[in-house]
């Protein structure tokens, strides 16, 4: 008999991200039938279990004790026990404790059964109106300003949709950093309190988002926020803004075409060749 048959099973069980109704029948049945539940926060998980009349043994597995508790869980799995891993909200391991446990299970060939379920990033993305074909998930934005800004700068020309989490305490600073490092005109969506009473999903250019948040503190003073940034798009000739065309036209009254194009490209961050092509087309009209 191989080691896979001797050991137990680790179930990765997603839990609601706000609305207690957002849990699958399979998830509830799994929580009822496993030998024990490894929870990020026992008190928080007990609220969910009581709601669904689930009675089971709970142990704590959080960011502070994850490495130590993973060893305990592994030993229990080796005895043939079935164990469920849950976080406070959403899918475990995704920005939540559980990585070390899952990694050890993979190394030891202990079977893992992941259940599908809630994830704030994916839920927000589905309703954002921003491309979902390709995206990168960056987790929580760094709390330190320089590290955060360096990360944002590195993503300025990322063509995929970008997803972040951010706290209510830093949302204004992070939006400011997006404006200053990426582009004030980049389209964003912010989704707060997904599935909860005060849920909202709002999309606009970055500078408008910042003004909108500042108008009413209640828009960001509670809950965590998902930030979704539209991917970088190269400006094509037809996409040259009216402001850029106006700048080029004014400069042409005083400077050569070469000088006018150079200055306009710097101001509006447009390729010089696109501006040349536009000027030539206008001349030929």
Curated annotation (Swiss-Prot):
It is found in: Cytoplasm. It is an enzyme of class 2 (transferase). InterPro entries: 4pyrrol_Mease, 4pyrrol_Methylase_sf, 4pyrrole_Mease_sub1, 4pyrrole_Mease_sub2, rRNA_ssu_MeTfrase_I, SAM_MeTrfase_RsmI_CS. Keywords: Cytoplasm, Methyltransferase, rRNA processing, S-adenosyl-L-methionine, Transferase. GO terms for molecular function: rRNA (cytosine-2'-O-)-methyltransferase activity. It catalyses: cytidine(1402) in 16S rRNA + S-adenosyl-L-methionine = 2'-O-methylcytidine(1402) in 16S rRNA + S-adenosyl-L-homocysteine + H(+). Catalyzes the 2'-O-methylation of the ribose of cytidine 1402 (C1402) in 16S rRNA. Belongs to the methyltransferase superfamily. RsmI family. The keyword Cytoplasm applies. Its EC number is 2.1.1.198. It comes from Buchnera aphidicola subsp. Schizaphis graminum (strain Sg). Gene3D superfamilies: Cobalt-precorrin-4 Transmethylase, Domain 1 (3.40.1010.10), Methyltransferase, Cobalt-precorrin-4 Transmethylase, Domain 2 (3.30.950.10). The lineage of its organism: Bacteria, Pseudomonadati, Pseudomonadota, Gammaproteobacteria, Enterobacterales. PROSITE patterns: RSMI (PS01296). This is Ribosomal RNA small subunit methyltransferase I. GO terms for cellular component: cytoplasm. It holds the Pfam family TP_methylase. The gene is rsmI.
């Amino acid at each position: 008999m191989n080691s896979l048959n001797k050991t137990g099973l680790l179930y990765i069980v997603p839990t609601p991200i706000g609305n207690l109704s957002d849990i699958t029948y399979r998830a509830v049945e799994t929580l009822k039938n496993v030998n024990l539940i490894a929870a990020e926060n026992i008190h928080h998980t007990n609220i969910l279990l009581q709601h669904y009349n689930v009675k089971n043994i709970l142990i704590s597995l959080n960011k502070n004790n994850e490495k130590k508790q993973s060893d305990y869980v592994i030993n229990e799995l080796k005895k043939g026990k079935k164990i469920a891993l849950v976080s406070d909200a959403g899918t475990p391991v995704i920005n939540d404790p559980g990585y070390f446990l899952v990694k050890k299970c993979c190394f030891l060939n202990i079977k893992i059964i992941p259940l599908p379920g809630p994830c704030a990033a994916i839920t927000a993305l589905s309703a954002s109106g921003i491309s979902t074909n390709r995206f990168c998930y960056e987790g929580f934005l760094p709390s330190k300003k320089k590290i955060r800004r360096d990360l944002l700068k590195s993503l300025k020309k990322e063509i995929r949709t970008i997803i972040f989490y951010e706290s209510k305490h830093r949302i204004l600073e992070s939006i400011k950093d997006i404006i200053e490092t990426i582009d004030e005109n980049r389209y964003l969506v912010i989704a707060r309190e997904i599935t909860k009473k005060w849920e909202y999903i709002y999309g606009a250019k970055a500078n408008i988002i910042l003004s909108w948040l500042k108008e009413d503190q209640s828009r960001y003073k509670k809950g965590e926020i998902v930030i979704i940034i539209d991917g970088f798009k190269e400006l094509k000739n037809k996409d040259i803004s009216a402001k850029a065309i106006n700048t080029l036209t004014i400069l042409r009254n005083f400077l050569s075409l070469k000088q006018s194009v150079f200055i306009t490209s710097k101001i509006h961050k447009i390729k010089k060749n696109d501006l040349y092509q536009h000027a030539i087309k206008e001349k030929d009209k």
